[in-house]
């Protein structure tokens, strides 16, 4: 029978140096590290936009602010932080709204002779060179595949409720790595990259590796909670709860911002233009929306 541990507070917080030492302390392995580590990071930004015009303006603002080009820069920073090498970038802005980016990565630099010819190695993003047809070089023949290997993806979902004046912006980020790379040390950067009212994180480890004596290991680093890898200052502004299944190497943390400062949730509107009673009603509506997201 699986044991599930649920906590309302942070479990065993370590300082940043201790966190880094966990990631840097390596087992002596036999052959390739076959562990797959996957971090799913979901954030919700919530806004009060009363009129239909305000709702559409909010969606347009979010859609432009977090377009595929900016998201690509965020993922490239994540790739750099985990010490990986870009093999291929695929990005797209959608109509009427939303964007996605997919970055195929390798654990270390690969000889170009061994990189599949369909991979663009990030050239459409890094290079502005145009071919004879006016397209960015290599962009028109990009193929993105091998999603069972190490990759980083992001998808955005802006939307608004037609009745209760609440608009939301959801971002889904997945960092999946094979080998020695762990995505956990990117958490603080990802939290800072978005206006995060609600954060849901899932981390799991699959497969096994062996040490030099042949003993199996189902994890190559210590972890009791995802919160161990988040800075204390960030944890103070959120209520956090864990649901962890240690035997299966499954870790889940949900964080909800503690204080709602109404001005931060209004779109193109000043809080002092709203009557006190209505302010309270809006605040309660925002809180209910957060709790049911």
Give the location of each predicted region.
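Polybasic/polar functional segments that serve as interface/processing modules
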Residues: 2-290
């Amino acid at each position: 029978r699986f044991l599930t541990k649920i906590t309302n507070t942070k479990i065993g917080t370590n300082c940043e140096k201790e966190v880094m030492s966990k990631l840097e302390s390596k087992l002596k392995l036999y052959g390739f590290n076959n562990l797959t580590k996957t971090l799913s990071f979901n954030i919700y930004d919530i806004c009060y936009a009363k009129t239909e015009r305000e709702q559409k303006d909010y969606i347009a603002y979010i859609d432009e602010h977090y377009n595929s080009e900016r998201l690509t820069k965020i993922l490239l920073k994540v790739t750099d932080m985990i010490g990986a090498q870009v093999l291929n970038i695929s990005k797209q802005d959608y109509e009427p709204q939303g964007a996605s980016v997919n970055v195929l990565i390798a654990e270390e630099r690969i000889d170009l002779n061994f990189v599949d010819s369909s991979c663009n190695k990030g050239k459409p993003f890094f290079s502005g060179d145009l071919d004879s047809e006016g397209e960015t070089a290599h962009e028109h023949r990009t193929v993105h595949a091998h999603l069972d290997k190490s990759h980083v993806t992001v998808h955005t979902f802006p939307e608004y409720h037609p009745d209760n004046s609440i608009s939301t912006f959801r971002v889904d980020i997945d960092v999946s790595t094979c080998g020695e790379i762990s995505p956990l040390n990117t958490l603080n950067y990802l939290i800072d990259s978005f206006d995060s009212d609600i954060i849901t994180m899932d981390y799991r480890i699959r497969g096994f590796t062996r040490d030099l004596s042949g003993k199996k290991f189902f994890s190559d680093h210590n972890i009791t909670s995802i919160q161990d890898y988040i800075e204390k200052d960030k944890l103070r502004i959120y209520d956090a709860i864990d649901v962890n299944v240690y035997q299966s190497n499954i870790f889940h943390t949900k964080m909800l911002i503690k204080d709602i400062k109404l001005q931060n949730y209004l779109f193109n509107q000043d809080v002092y233009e709203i009557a006190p009673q209505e302010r309270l009603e809006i605040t309660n509506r925002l809180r209910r929306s957060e709790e049911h997201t």
